[in-house]
């Protein structure tokens, strides 16, 4: 397989991953979008966390809400818990890396807020701890996961929402996660500010 064929294969794999996910996760995306819009409409906020590429996704989602997505509208309250290196390193140093998001959630989260927890495996200790901290604060968790959902899926309550990408490949899961994030932004905007499908 030459380089062009490899690139074409990766495109086809990504398209297939999205097609395979559509029917399985579309209802969960709609449910999550409605929950987020309801929370934001009630002057609540969304806290977001993830590791590595999922940390970048957390910041991407936060920026789309704080600034704008595809329509002009006021900024919406969203905080990526992945951006403050002083806080992350002090918590990791003084306590444990598993607590880097949980301690922030206990300080910033309130009942009615939403946690968007992003993990391709669902097995990251700090993401599981974040979900547990959110539950303690009376928050709903929306979990973006993949594979079998991992420990994160096992800790979710009936009020929480899991959007699990049916793939075993990290890159494909991440690609679907990005599309899910854009779907959530679109649903939030249309629910709160109108437009087709709102």
Curated annotation (Swiss-Prot):
One of its GO terms (molecular function) is D-sedoheptulose 7-phosphate isomerase activity. Transmembrane segments: none annotated. Residues 36-198 form the SIS domain. Its main location: cytoplasm. One of its GO terms (cellular component) is cytoplasm. Substrate binds at residues 51-53, 64, 93-94, 119-121, 124, 174. Its cofactor is Zn(2+). Its EC number is 5.3.1.28. PANTHER family: DNAA INITIATOR-ASSOCIATING PROTEIN DIAA, SEDOHEPTULOSE 7-PHOSPHATE ISOMERASE / DNAA INITIATOR-ASSOCIATING FACTOR FOR REPLICATION INITIATION. Catalyzes the isomerization of sedoheptulose 7-phosphate in D-glycero-D-manno-heptose 7-phosphate. This is Phosphoheptose isomerase.
């Amino acid at each position: 397989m030459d380089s062009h064929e490899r690139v074409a294969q990766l495109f086809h794999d990504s398209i297939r991953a999205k097609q395979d996910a559509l029917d399985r996760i579309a209802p969960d995306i709609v449910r999550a979008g409605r929950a987020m819009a309801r929370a934001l409409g009630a002057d609540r906020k969304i806290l977001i966390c993830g590791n590595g590429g999922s940390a970048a996704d957390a910041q991407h989602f936060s920026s789309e809400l704080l600034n704008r997505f595809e329509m002009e509208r006021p900024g919406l309250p969203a905080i990526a818990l992945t951006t403050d290196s002083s806080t992350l390193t002090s918590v990791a140093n003084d306590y444990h890396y598993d607590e880097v998001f949980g301690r922030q959630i206990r300080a910033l989260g309130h009942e009615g807020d939403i946690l968007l927890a992003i993990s391709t495996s669902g097995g990251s200790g700090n993401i599981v701890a974040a979900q547990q901290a959110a539950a303690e604060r009376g928050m709903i968790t929306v979990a973006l996961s993949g594979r079998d959902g991992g420990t994160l899926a096992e800790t979710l309550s009936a009020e929480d929402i899991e959007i699990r990408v049916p793939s075993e490949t990290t890159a494909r899961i991440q690609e679907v996660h990005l599309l899910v994030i854009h779907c959530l932004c679109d649903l939030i905007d249309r629910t709160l500010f109108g437009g087709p499908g709102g």
